[in-house]
Amino acid sequence: MTCTILVGGQWGDEGKGKCITYFCTQDKPEIIARAGVGPNAGHSVEFNGEKYGLRLTPSGFFNKEARLLIGAGVLVNPEVFEHELEYLSKYAVEGRTFMDANCAIITDKHTKQDKDSAYLSKKIGTTGSGCGPANADRINRTIDYAKDVPELEKYITDVPSEINKAIDEGKDVFIEGSQGFGLSLYYGTYPYVTSKDTCASTAAADVGVGPTKVDEVIVIFKSYITRVGEGPFPTEISPEEAEKMGIEEYGVVTGRKRRVGLFDKDFAKRSCMINGATQIALTCIDRLYPECAKVNKYEDLSQEARDYIEDIEENVGVPITIISTGPDLADTIDLRNEKLN
């Protein structure tokens, strides 16, 4: 039984939703915990032919046996939280979705400040979700916590106690981060970053898990890179080149068109170093090599695709254990047994 953390290795939009869905289907963790900044990041999840866009609820919600927890490090907008409970009602998330008492609360004041700031909205490219101003208030110790909001009382639990008890009992725990390494307040392309760190160590702290309790850190990369908003992007290609490659993507929260670039092995190596990666999940290989769409055996990938994957693995120095070849759960090559045992 393991405690696993999954975080993004680039600038977000790496395909965390699909991979989390896969892990939570295959491994069936008893607890799925949400770490990260807050509702400024969207996870796209496809399950049973339906697509969901989530901003707070853990992406493994479809596993009806799992408890879904939101760690104290995560900012909560009660309106977004309530909306997602209703939105996902067919999966019986009510009664098994809880947040820590110390989650800080985003209010209309914070979202207004975010949207009204020309610096944040135009220069930095904020999503307008209120996370930056809310984290500023948190640092100044002027923000309300979930325990201060009567309407949230029935959703409050002691997240660190629940998770650590589960780990001590030998149960599987899955912790999902949000956004990506390049957006880290500490290690990203400052000032074009989010309002806190996005690395695996912070994800563990967000939910109250000490570093010695973590068994696996999976860093997820897209086979190419995308970025929403402003900021340095060394391997960026022109929209015309991206169009020739057949790549056109839009952000889940903002709807803004994503910038596109080539895979950056040096950036990936640094991302894996700082995150302490034990595994890599690589997504969207089918976008670069369309002949690999829906392949679920490594030997059935084209030689060109295999060479591409093996070159990344050799240069980054971390085993690539999961390869996504399409949006469906079946479109996955799982090499964990071969590479980790």
Curated annotation (Swiss-Prot):
Keyword Calcium carried by entry: no
Residues noted as binding substrate in the record, renumbered to the chain: 252-258
UniProt binding sites for Mg(2+): 13, 42
EC numbers on record: 6.3.4.4
The protein's annotated pathway: Purine metabolism; AMP biosynthesis via de novo pathway; AMP from IMP: step 1/2
Annotated residues for binding of IMP: 13-16, 40-43, 127, 141, 179, 194, 256
Domain of life of the native organism: Archaea
UniProtKB keywords: Cytoplasm, GTP-binding, Ligase, Magnesium, Metal-binding, Nucleotide-binding, Purine biosynthesis
Catalytic residues in the record: 13 (proton acceptor), 43 (proton donor)
Cystine residue pairs: none
Annotated binding of GTP, by residue: 12-18, 42-44, 258, 284-286, 324-326
Record note on cofactor: Binds 1 Mg(2+) ion per subunit.
Coiled coil: none
Any GO CC annotation of this UniProt entry: cytoplasm
Compartment(s) where it occurs, according to its Swiss-Prot or TrEMBL record: Cytoplasm
Cofactor (UniProt): Mg(2+)
One protein family per Pfam: Adenylsucc_synt
BP GO annotations: 'de novo' AMP biosynthetic process; IMP metabolic process
Keyword S-adenosyl-L-methionine attributed: no
Family, similarity comment: Belongs to the adenylosuccinate synthetase family.
Primary role: Plays an important role in the de novo pathway of purine nucleotide biosynthesis. Catalyzes the first committed step in the biosynthesis of AMP from IMP.
Name of the molecule in the record: Adenylosuccinate synthetase
Organism this protein belongs to: Methanosphaera stadtmanae (strain ATCC 43021 / DSM 3091 / JCM 11832 / MCB-3)
Recorded name of the encoding gene: purA
